[in-house]
Amino acid sequence: STLVTGVVPAAIASVGGLFVDAVANSLLQNGNDFSDFRQEVLIYVLVELGLVLLLTASQRLNMLCQSILRALLGNKINVMILEKALTLELGHFEDSEYYDKLVRARREASSRPLSLIVKTFDLFRDVITLVTIGIFLFQFSAWASILLLIAGVPAFAAENKFSGEAFRNQRRRSAERRLQVYLEMVLTREDGVKEVKLFQLGKHFLKRYIDIFNRIYREDKSLVLRRTAWGYIFGLLASLSFYFAYGWVGFSAILGVITIGQMTMYIAQFRIGQNAVTSSLTAINGMYEDNLYLSNLDEYMNHEVPELSGTKAYGPIRGDGVRFEDVSFIYPGSAKPALDKISIHIKPGESLAIVGENGSGKTTLIKLLTRLYKPTSGRIFLEGLDLEEWDIDVLRKKVGVIFQDFNRYQLVVGENIGIGDIKDSDDLERVQEAAQKGMADSFIKDLPDAYSTQLGSWFKNGRELSGGQWQKIALSRAFMRKSADILVLDEPTAAIDAKAEAEIFAHFRELTKNRISIIISHRFSTVRMADHIIVFEKGRVVEEGSHPELIEKQGIYENLFELQAQGYK
């Protein structure tokens, strides 16, 4: 169809010229029999009609193909981006520079690849048109063909320059654009609007949003004005070249060099050719611009991610548990270690509690255990095998974790809990059992559709839960992992009352009798239940032992315990 749309316009112009000559010849008969000319005119009309219908059908076919390709290609690129995201480490998402790459790639992913393909076919069509038109115009004058080709070059050069400038502006402003999107979310999402109203932040955030827009608008306005002005000037040059050719062809007809029909044909073909030159140069410029934006996608997709080389599914010492040997970790860009030479041994069946001030390294330790981070130095062993040698999927199936910033999935209740063990996520009996252990079954029964109730406010008929209820859903999700050898609760019960927490951890102890359990909590009523307690301070283990042993030491733990106990006196 591209070939047809490239050739047919020139053919239509040629037939139009023959039609005009046929009409002119019939008018010169001066009353003679001109039935033959009538037939000739009719043939040209029918031929041109057929060509127009063919051209229209080809254009519609192109539109159909583009519509189908837009959906398929857009989805394919988005899936590629998401598949790449699955291979990234947590540190990539916490790196603002790399996250900008992801945002830039996603912003243009659905439109630029198709745009590049469409412009490539447009260029192919325009080249065919120009070759066809050039053959006809060359019969009139070689200089006409040359004039046709050079008329649009200045406009192309200017547009190419401004496209590059626009791309560099967009790339430089990635962080500002991301801040705008964030401010939109804060002002419109249910999880942010409460504080926005209570602290009267609406006007403040809206002003920041508008200020960012105004800065971007001023830059874009300047670029658009310059782009438009130069486009107008060079457009005038193209128009002058056309009307020069227009007059040239007209005078040639007056002098009898060409017929009236040929004059009509050459004028039409020069107009078609001029449009084809402009279109082809625009396509080339658009391809250049699309390639600039697709470089964002290429940069993101080709970013090297360290290969997860581990292949082992079990360790040589099945009863050895977890060992941290002289482990340190430093966050990128930080001068101080988040963890400093940590050495811990946790045996199967042992419950470990970790206490310490916020920022002391407790959660970082868990992220190292789950290989969300890699140690800066030192080694971590599970069953006597270095974590780096474990198959990552096998390792993560052996660990069940609920972080303090757990996800509130906008899914139905059953799925919200069931995804804790994805292979049994549809097993309602397992889900209900996990909900009982997580103390969530009592309020789930009161929901409109019980385990089929939509949670959250994003979708129709969704029910929003309280903070404590969401935490019980998250705990239930952790209890789905029956096969996990290690279960970790990282401050997941902060919004639950002390009585409910005690009941939950009683279930937790029962569930983890022969497994490793790790609890991070600020509530000493929970912490004291653990077999072993370690105290973190500034990334180091400063105290460890059982609750009675640490109280007897009268150190940091005893001081924190007494401070909390005084609140209940």
What positions do the PLM features span?
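Membrane-integrated ABC transporters
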Residues: S1-P9, L28-Y44, N62-Q66, E83, ...
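Transmembrane helix-loop-helix hairpins at lipid-water interfaces of multipass membrane proteins
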Residues: S1-S58, G134-A166, L240-G247, F251-I260, ...
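Juxtamembrane helix-loop junctions of ABC transporter transmembrane domains
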Residues: P9-G16, V52-E94, Y98, F162-F167, ...
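Alpha-helical transmembrane segments of polytopic integral membrane proteins
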Residues: A13-V20, N78-L82, D95, Y99, ...
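Extended non-transmembrane interhelical loops and adjacent amphipathic helices
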Residues: R70-L114, E176-E219, N291-N302, S452-T453
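Hydrophobic patch in the ABC ATPase nucleotide-binding domain
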Residues: T87-L90, H303-P306, A440-I444
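Cytosolic ends of transmembrane helices, especially the final helix of ABC transmembrane type-1 domains
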Residues: R172, L201, L225, A245, ...
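ABC-type nucleotide-binding domain
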Residues: S309-G310, G315-K569
